[in-house]
A protein has these predicted regions:
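Extracellular ligand-binding/catalytic regions of CAZymes and related secreted enzymes
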Residues: 197, 237-294, 401-407, 521, ...
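Secretory targeting signals
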Residues: 36-40, 94-158
Length: 763
């Protein structure tokens, strides 16, 4: 009982020393400012490059901790009297460790509101946030125990601070050594295993991995145990042979637990969309495997040493293979067996190059991360994968095709005079990567109509300005003959996207007239929305001084004619549209017409000016910024619709009762040039995800669509509605994090210091 009271008194004294010492508040402010500035300013959060992915947020914590944690663990004057305290060495060490961990935990808690500010602009994954925070506590426990160990070894606080910081720097950056230096596999695996960043990778994605949990707990215990031994030795204690045996045994068991944490493990997926978990559809699909299904993962060891997410792929494949006794899983390393490279080449798989730097020289390694699937004598491949975000979909679609011998076919046509090799050059590779077989239809081919009649499957059309009446008749006949559903991207206007963005009226609108016959109408307006994409403009000012460099200026403008649609039922991540036209629905339509894409409630229109046929509306971003839109009527508007049920022909006498057609009023939404404009540093491919989801839906593969769309968690800043609101929340965020939070920390420190002084005056 007396020992417990003494322990509580020491713990309380340590906490009082920490919370009344200026260094604690200095490092607290430094910690919070570094994380905030790194994420919100250095990463360009407010400059069009922002993302709500907390992976970037957490990544800065280990680096600032190199200085912060040794500062927290710095020995104050009161620690000099520890040897005179009637308390066991373990409790003395543990009291210092626990008080430091409490201080660090408070620092970590300060990060929660810092992360929640992201919700002003986009959606954060709460599971990712709290699993990340929990593992930061474990990480703090681990590095504090290391600092405690060096505090006991070195008498000088300055020396222990420097050594602790150096050791933490090594542990935090260990995984980078294998990037810049060449090591054997054993040494590389060891370096990877001791890396803190490597063990935090899963947690930063919202996964509770018992291997990482055991690593942090076991490492904390080992260094605390060593600290106690050091304290006992410094007191002059001589251990008996039995005690030495016990110490060696405890230390050995701890090391074995640490090293064997990888043997038996569990992973719990707390991410919002359960990206790293097997879905019900996959479990049901696996029940159809009646023969041997082999999964062979060709993974270069040089690649797995460098990227922790490669471990996720192996784990997911192991879970996948456990679904059915007929599934077998094997890993092969092309780095160890050079003949495997030839095997992969026979499958049409080539290596990917990876750059490494060794002894001031740059080398390029050929690496593989490929999956070969074999079922009933048939083979298919996933050529290269680096994460599990789309792995379940990739496996399911290939397994489904092998079991049911049914391919996904999409017939694609550029009806606006553009082509798939320059203007839509991402479309075919993207479709192929998602398991679709593309059948290109060419209007310039004299056999276009015959080729269309021979085809079957979903029809994907971009624009109709070059589609003549004969071609329109053939397309309508294709739809009415139930050969396949259709995804029509139509707009009665064309834009000179590669020059001045001027808008002109199309001379041919045969498909427009066809779909208007089915109960929808394209209005003579262009949609504008304050919730829109941003354009980054660059200008260079030449200097008069020949010895100075020219100045480059960057300006980011909201461009309301590129409406950014928020996530909705048919677009899980949202969509960016380019010069879209509002669609209205006729009440007397015989088919079922349902809106699938709508704008924000603040969207408005620019009316078409037919008196200026060369430029029907103003499209210059600088001129648009000057226009006062306060008097324009604001409302949600329809950009896309689904037609289903009965359809009757405009050009043909035929009809169908089971149509399923998607129509959006934007022919450029997957155009290569437009994708480049909105891509930013991280790439914005939401439009392509939307395209794949709808093609899967139209191909009667709604289960696969649900697998594909579950990974489409929108990490963009889609909640922004207008520039004024964006700037307002930007100011609130920066003022709160850079000024208000530090001031609150200072006020807390001053109040505790005053309280201590008052207390001392009454003694």
């Amino acid at each position: 009982m007396k020992q417990d009271k003494t322990f509580s008194a020491i713990l309380k004294n340590n906490l009082q020393s920490s919370f009344t010492h200026a260094i604690t508040y200095v490092v607290a402010i430094l910690f919070e400012l570094f994380i905030s500035i790194n994420f919100y300013i250095r990463k360009g959060f407010f400059l069009g490059n922002g993302t709500s992915d907390l992976l970037l947020f957490f990544s800065a914590v280990p680096y600032i901790s190199i200085i912060i944690v040794p500062s927290i663990c710095y020995k104050f004057e009161s620690s000099l009297y520890d040897n005179f305290v009637p308390l066991k060495s373990f409790k003395i060490v543990f009291s210092h460790y626990l008080s430091n961990l409490i201080v660090f935990s408070i620092f970590i808690i300060f990060l929660i509101p810092c992360a929640l500010f992201i919700n002003f602009f986009g959606s954060i994954d709460i599971g990712q946030l709290f699993i990340g925070i929990f593992f930061l506590f474990l990480y703090g426990s681990c590095i504090i125990s290391i600092c405690s160990f060096f505090n006991e070894i070195f008498t000088s606080p300055i020396v222990s601070f420097i050594v602790s910081a150096l050791v933490l720097a090594i542990f935090n950056c260990a995984h980078l050594f294998v990037v810049y230096f060449s090591f054997s596999n054993i040494i590389s695996n060891f370096i990877k295993y001791i890396s803190f960043a490597w063990h935090f990778d899963a947690a930063s994605k919202g996964i509770f991995d018992t291997r990482d949990f055991i690593y942090f707990i076991a490492t904390s215990f080992i260094f605390l145990f060593l600290s106690v031994i050091v304290v006992e030795l410094k007191k002059g204690r001589i251990f008996s042979k039995k005690q030495k045996t016990s110490i060696i045994l405890i230390f050995g068991i701890s090391i074995l637990i640490l090293l064997n944490g990888n043997s038996y493990y569990k992973r719990f997926d707390f991410s919002k969309n359960k990206t790293f978990s097997i879905s019900k559809y996959t479990k049901k699909l696996s029940e159809n495997i009646t023969d041997s299904f082999k999964i062979t993962y060709y993974r270069s060891s040089s690649l797995s040493r460098l990227y922790p997410q490669i471990r996720d792929i192996q784990d997911f494949l192991q879970i996948y293979s456990s679904l059915n006794k007929n599934i077998s899983f094997l890993i092969k390393d092309p780095d160890k067996d050079s003949s495997l490279s030839q095997v992969l080449e026979n499958y049409g798989i080539t290596s990917q190059q990876m750059r490494t730097i060794d002894n001031n020289s740059t080398q390029y390694l050929n690496v593989y991360s490929s999956i070969i699937l074999e079922y009933q004598g048939n083979f298919t491949a996933i050529p290269f994968t680096m994460d599990v975000e789309t792995l379940e979909y990739d496996l399911d679609i290939k397994l489904s095709q092998m079991i049911f011998n049914k391919n996904l076919v999409v017939n694609i046509l550029c009806g606006n005079g553009m082509n798939f090799y320059e203007d839509y050059n991402y479309v075919i590779p993207w479709l192929n990567s998602q398991g679709f077989i593309c059948n290109l239809l060419d209007l310039q081919n004299s056999n276009f109509i015959n080729n269309l009649n021979k085809s079957s499957g979903t029809l994907l059309i971009f624009g109709d300005s070059e589609i003549n009446i004969e071609n329109a008749i053939a397309i309508e006949n294709y739809i009415l003959s139930d050969k396949g559903n259709a995804f029509l991207c139509l707009n009665p206007y064309s834009v000179k996207i590669d020059t001045d963005w001027s808008i002109t009226q199309n001379q041919k609108t045969n498909l427009i007239e066809m779909v208007e016959n089915w109960g929808i109408h394209f209005e003579e307006k262009i949609i504008a929305d304050p919730s829109c994409a941003k354009i980054t403009l660059y200008s260079q000012e030449e200097s008069d001084n020949p010895f100075s460099q020219n100045s480059t200026y960057t300006k980011v403008l909201n461009y309301p004619l590129w409406a950014s649609l928020m996530p909705q039922e048919y677009a899980k991540s949202g969509v960016t549209t380019f010069w879209a036209v509002p669609i209205s629905i006729n009440d007397d339509s015989s088919s079922l017409v349902k809106p699938i894409l709508i704008t924000s409630s603040q969207s408005y229109n620019y009316d078409i000016d037919k008196n200026n046929p060369s430029s029907l509306i103003q499209t210059n971003p600088f001129e648009l910024a000057k226009i006062n839109t306060s008097n324009k009527q604001k409302s949600t508007q329809i950009v896309g619709v689904e037609l289903s049920g009965k359809l009757e022909g405009l050009y043909n006498y035929g009809s169908t009762s089971s149509a399923k057609i998607f129509i959006i009023s934007d022919q450029y939404f997957v155009n290569s040039l437009m994708t480049g404009y909105i891509g930013g540093d991280f790439g914005d491919y939401r439009n392509f995800d939307f395209m794949i989801d709808e093609l899967l839906y139209l191909s009667e593969n709604e289960d696969l669509m649900s697998i594909h769309s579950k990974n489409n968690f929108d990490k963009t800043l889609y909640k922004i509605t207008d520039e004024y609101t964006f700037v307002k929340y930007e100011i609130i965020t920066l003022v709160s994090l850079i000024f208000i939070f530090p001031i609150l920390i200072i006020c807390l420190g001053v109040s505790l210091w005053i309280r201590k002084k008052i207390k001392l005056t009454h003694i």
